[in-house]
């Protein structure tokens, strides 16, 4: 059985009704999102961790960045197979939002 992770999207801001439609279209195309539901101002994305490929993780990064969703929760997907591009790439647009600032 695949492990499931729940990502929380709090108070997602849509700029128009079409923007909201596109958000839900986008999440429907990310293969690792098994399902979603919501309560009040929170949307829960149920992630099948066995399906989190590099491509799917990049889509989650872009989605969370675009809609200003807390990206720190994406740290859970760091592993030896994606470490080089996901963590070691300190200049990537997502790095600070996912991993914070490293103080040397």
Labelled PLM ranges:
Residues 1-2:
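Short N-terminal edge-element motif at the start of the domain
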Residues 17-21, 54-57:
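Conserved strand-to-helix beginnings and helix N-cap segments that scaffold or border functional pockets
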Residues 41-51:
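A generic structural motif
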Residues 27-39:
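Short acidic amphipathic segments
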Residues 40-41, 77:
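Residue-level "edge-of-site" marker
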Residues 23-25:
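Histidine-anchored nucleotide/phosphate-binding helix
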Residues 49-104:
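Helix-rich interaction surfaces within compact, conserved domain-sized segments
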Residues 9-19:
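Short, surface-exposed ligand-recognition loops at beta-strand->loop->(often short) alpha-helix junctions
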